[in-house]
Amino acid sequence: MNNRILLNIKNLDVTIGETQILNSLNLSIKPGEIHAIMGKNGSGKSTLAKVIAGHPSYKITNGQILFENQDVTEIEPEDRSHLGIFLAFQYPVEIPGVTNADFLRIAYNAKRAFDNKEELDPLSFFSFIENKISNIDLNSTFLSRNVNEGFSGGEKKKNEILQMSLLNSKLAILDETDSGLDIDALKTIAKQINSLKTQENSIILITHYQRLLDYIKPDYIHVMQKGEIIYTGGSDTAMKLEKYGYDYLNK
């Protein structure tokens, strides 16, 4: 049994402006685990994702975020990324004028520099990334396109998964990855996420619906309400929520 804790959140209070959004939140995740976070709109799910990644709009007023036993509560988002924390956004942004090849190479080489490794030149990187692309069922012409510009919903999500694979993230936080996907695209994305899962990395899935969890089975499901985790259960929790709604947890 693995007793090592990858992510440990202790008594976290978070505000934005004068509004408190997270309240004394606790969460611990071991390597190799998949955790799903569910809850109604406005329950704090996406806020939690952004706070773990270090979004500057949110202020932590109490508590700690430990990643591999290192306190990352106050460190910059890019440093958290270098340590192995990856956030896939619900709505990935377009970056006109920047090709995927350039964007991915810069991100990858920044990670290598942090790890005290030599950067890859463009030719070496292209050979490296082509293998990653084929594993995620993307055409190599994808590299010459601008980041997310004119992409379908499925292509944007595949791009996020490619970044997750490229950076070899230890903790991937996927914020409503199923949003806007038809069933075929959802199955494809889920298959790719499952293929990247190892006993050394962990995944947080943030979702409203059971359908994503039909294809990616979580070890634990946490339900959030008003900035708190009010319930933690097994993978069958999603089916109960689908059948009875969130209110049954308050009965």
Swiss-Prot record:
GO terms, molecular function: ATP binding; ATP hydrolysis activity
Origin: domain of life: Eukaryota
UniProt key word Transport: yes
Keywords linked to the UniProt accession: ATP-binding, Chloroplast, Nucleotide-binding, Plastid, Transport
Subcellular compartments: Plastid, Chloroplast
Coiled coil location: none
Chain sites annotated for binding ATP: 39-46
Every ABC transporter domain range: 7-251
One Gene Ontology CC term in the entry: chloroplast
PROSITE patterns, per database record: ABC_TRANSPORTER_1 (PS00211), ABC_TRANSPORTER_2 (PS50893)
Family designation: Belongs to the ABC transporter superfamily. Ycf16 family.
Protein known as: Probable ATP-dependent transporter ycf16
Protein species of origin: Antithamnion sp.
